[in-house]
Amino acid sequence: MNKFNFQNLKKPFIIAEMSGNHNHSLERALQIVDAAAESGVDALKLQTYTADTLTIDKSDGEFFISDPNNLWKGESLYSLYQKAYTPWEWHKAIFDRCKEKGIVCFSTPFDFTAVDFLEELDCPIYKIASFENIDIPLIKRVAQTGKPMIVSTGMASLSELDDLVRTAKENGCQDLTLLKCTSSYPATPEGTNLLTIPHMKELFKCNVGLSDHTLGIGAAVASVALGATVIEKHFTLSRADGGVDAAFSMEPAEMAQLVRECNTACEALGEVSYEIQEQEKKSIVFRRSLYIVEDMKAGDRITEKNMRSIRPGLGLKPKYYNAVLGKKVVHDIKKGTKLTWDIIENFI
């Protein structure tokens, strides 16, 4: 797993983000692993933190979520993170289940202690969350592991992105993927701005993907057409079960559809080609071509009445229609005869 390389991807790398959708049940967490693997994803991602590594136990002022439009309104930051965190003692069991099911398991560390803990589990990839993409010391510490890094870019300015990319590369990261991300839960299609993906790829000379908080699969599939190589979506067994992130998470059948359609989009990109494809050759016969549509005698002239451009495509191409109008035929012709040069006077 330590040799995983995002430079060698042949298809989109699809990540199911468990986040807090385990609802504080290890059994449910393992069921999420099983369902994710069954849906065809490449990886399952955890988040490694505690409420105390993210904030302080304070429930007023700026530590309280009062925005009526916020998904987590009425919570303090501390109480929210207590509900959402994945107990560290579960990590090994989840990593082991992922290995058993044939998918990659990795995590997002939120402080140095989480990095140290994940290194003991031989975590093969590290993710930096959007809210931490300005935490340069953390980015530096993760880069120093030498593992591939994925960084969500939500809320980051261009200069902040430059800071994080430089920090990662200067501290040993040779395999960096930036994820276009809109840090809104859920995100709207009009606020997703997928056209940033090819620009970001060109600007920072690295792989680019999408951390997708929109509902449905449309944005993810479209991102593949724009060059996204990594797709991350939150994942749960059922939104009806509730949970801190359930409202914008994919269910198993939806994730399976996302995997299929992203792979189809990738295959369909192909290459720039104006050649007849091998699979098209049998269809050539059904193109239009010039045919005689009335019985004709030798010496009769070709007219708009006795010649038409019709299917099938075995006669002269329609572009010769005007060139042969008024020309004589050299022998009797039956209705339904394809027009060829050898039956036209002066074209033999």
Map each language-model feature to its residues.
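Catalytic cores and adjacent flexible loops of soluble metabolic enzymes
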Residues: 1-348
